[in-house]
């Protein structure tokens, strides 16, 4: 199974390779930054945009990806879980990223409350998402249900901005990427 996970992870990184430099700029890794990557899989992309962080934690619900990630990226910490119930104390991270994964969250309101809770004061949320018109077709719904238990919920950038505002995030920005868009907000 690790061969399949490796192939899928590498394919995902190849598809997003043009967005990784922008993502790294938004995450702004540094020696004082603790990063949580929600839905980070085996961490293959994470090491490309977050290297230089003091601590990198991958939160992933798929045990196969966690097993592969622990072997492939031993310096990273891997935790099984979902965004709706983050198993971390308050103020644990200066950055939280969700790279092409927020649309898989079953309860976005609960997830954003949890994300805000674990972000330290002044910490930043970085979302990289896909445009609905390009990815919300029947194939995405079927594949999402098969792989994640429910179909994905793709958001327009302005809708995601409004959701972040409603959850108390500030300094929100939306920028276009090569294969999607970025939304950032601070606690």
Regions found by a protein language model. Give the residues of each.
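C-terminal alpha-helical "lid/dimerization" subdomain adjacent to the S-adenosyl-L-methionine
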Residues: 3-17, 45, 126-184
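Conserved alpha-helix/loop element of class I SAM-dependent methyltransferases that forms part
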Residues: 13-33
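Structural signature of beta-strand start/N-cap positions in the alpha/beta core
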Residues: 34, 55, 77, 92-94, ...
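Class I SAM-dependent methyltransferase SAM/SAH-binding core
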Residues: 36, 41-85
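A conserved beta-strand element that flanks and buttresses the S-adenosyl-L-methionine
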Residues: 97
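Short catalytic micro-motifs in class I SAM-dependent methyltransferases
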Residues: 100-101
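A short glycine-rich, Lys/Arg-flanked "PGG" loop and its adjoining helix->strand segment in the class I
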Residues: 109-121
